């Protein structure tokens, strides 16, 4: 039995699972997102280069990926510290920081935030989507990639002794690339050896989550300790969602607070609003999947922070939970979604 067995590994070390409390399972606290920059049309280039101020906030909120400063979340450490204190004051206990290699993971900043706020922070090992893979990453074998993932959990990430507590978010594109397929196989191999939690970022196709689970299963992964992120923008059809839920992984609705007319990263996708997300969560509960649901905001741009008029990390606790109660999701079920399910997922086998 591993020394990690029965524990959760945070950036400050091992903790008892019961200490976590209400947990957001997919957030970012320090990252850059230049890989998803969308150049604006020529007529909007000037506004895209302006600093974030009240008069252009509406444009940036509607074109989040066309404003380069907006993609530099790593510049807002002090604001994020204040938000984490607010999150804790509103009943929050822990969050999983999903930044991996390719989007500027910074475990030292995560450690400092955990020390200064008292919020349990779990860091992710792994690689983001193919567009961020280095030539070195592409050249690695599955065995070499497995070693990298395991090293992040057993010894430390980013050249530090600060250890990751999950593998992910593992980035997948659509269609899946060969490099991403190798990373998925390595993820399964590392999970099989460590008994660790895994979290996946699927490509923007309803077929992507099914393909990813199949690849993980064939490589020996434990699907019961695997999270499929971003289902709110990936599987929109009810029947297809319930078909996916049968596969046994965690279904994560992690874009709470994101309400867009036009989704730049997937123009064919009509991004649901929070009321639609709540209805999908309620559907999964009604169909018997309350033990397999997780929620979060996936904050990864500046304008989603309270400092810039955004909803912040406390939106689910302060706004979404009351609406869920109003829509018939019970306190007992909400405790499962926010406390028990994250605890079960994050605990090493």
Curated annotation (Swiss-Prot):
Gene name tied to this protein: PTER
UniProt cofactor(s): a divalent metal cation
Entry's Gene Ontology BP terms: catabolic process; regulation of appetite; taurine metabolic process
Main location: cytoplasm
Lineage top rank: taxon: Eukaryota
EC identifiers of the protein: 3.1.-.-
PROSITE patterns to which the protein is assigned, alphabetical: PHOSPHOTRIESTERASE_1, PHOSPHOTRIESTERASE_2
Record: residues binding a divalent metal cation 2: 169, 201, 230
Family, similarity comment: Belongs to the metallo-dependent hydrolases superfamily. Phosphotriesterase family.
GO function terms (MF aspect): N-acetyltaurine hydrolase activity; zinc ion binding
Full protein name: N-acetyltaurine hydrolase
Keyword field contains Chaperone: no
Gene3D superfamilies for this protein: Metal-dependent hydrolases
Cofactor note: Binds 2 divalent metal cations per subunit.
Catalyzed chemical reaction(s): N-acetyltaurine + H2O = taurine + acetate; N-propanoyltaurine + H2O = propanoate + taurine; N-acetyl-L-methionine + H2O = L-methionine + acetate; N-acetyl-L-isoleucine + H2O = L-isoleucine + acetate
